Regions:
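Glycoside hydrolase catalytic-domain context in secreted enzymes
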Residues: 1-210
């Protein structure tokens, strides 16, 4: 069978945290389980934008049920290698197919008032050393292929969130790259939404926060 995660596994039940989406620890809905669907690669293989749009609507609706204001997806990176552990989060190796599917998905999810945030900007392609690996490519490769999924998500679907990648663009961390985030993302594409680094995995973060 396919395992489905309960809401309680992810929900913040610490009401003192100041989190507007915190849930009461005794809330009976914590036992609610999410439905499990096929991944983005399978959706893309249908070449069906209507299906991708329905998929987005389901995820948007789930976000309301689970008290989420932001849905961190869809994945708009390309498959550059069959060995990338995140390929299930990305549609395909083709920039045009990826763009069409992402736009349809985001448009569907937005109908529920949820911020849909495509990821990982930009060039994520490996889980090994992903928090510091340097990615190099020509500007033509970046603009014609790697960036097009995210660009379409913003320009054509009006995505209001973006998650940046852990890797480096050249030798600069993606979340600190002025050319990528200021000049291209906000300057050329006109993005005015929420920009977030990938999920915090440092165990010292809680200590630093205190």
């Amino acid at each position: 069978g396919i395992y489905s995660y309960p809401l309680g596994q992810y929900a913040n039940t610490d009401k003192s945290s100041g989190d507007p989406c915190a849930v009461d620890a005794n809330d009976p809905n914590l036992a609610y389980k999410f439905g499990t669907m096929v991944n983005e690669t399978v959706i893309a293989q249908t070449f069906n934008k209507d299906l991708a749009n329905e998929y987005g609507k389901i995820c948007g609706n789930y976000s309301l049920w689970s008290n989420l204001t932001i849905f961190w997806g869809c994945g708009t990176n390309l498959h550059r290698s069959p060995y990338n552990a995140r390929n299930h989060e990305y549609y395909s190796e083709d920039a045009v197919l990826t763009s069409g599917q992402a736009v349809a998905f985001i448009s569907g999810g937005k109908e529920y008032g949820v911020i849909i945030a495509p990821k990982h900007l930009a060039f994520n392609d490996t889980e090994i050393n992903r928090t510091g690996v340097s990615v190099f490519m020509t500007e033509q490769q970046a603009r014609e292929n790697e960036l097009r999924g995210t660009q379409a998500s913003i320009e054509d679907a009006g995505a209001l969130g973006v998650m940046t990648a852990f890797n480096r663009v050249g030798i600069t961390a993606a979340n600190a790259h002025t050319g990528l985030l200021k000049n291209i993302l906000r300057g050329e594409w006109g993005f005015k939404g929420l920009e977030s680094q990938d999920f915090i995995m440092n165990p010292n973060y809680a200590v630093l926060k205190e």
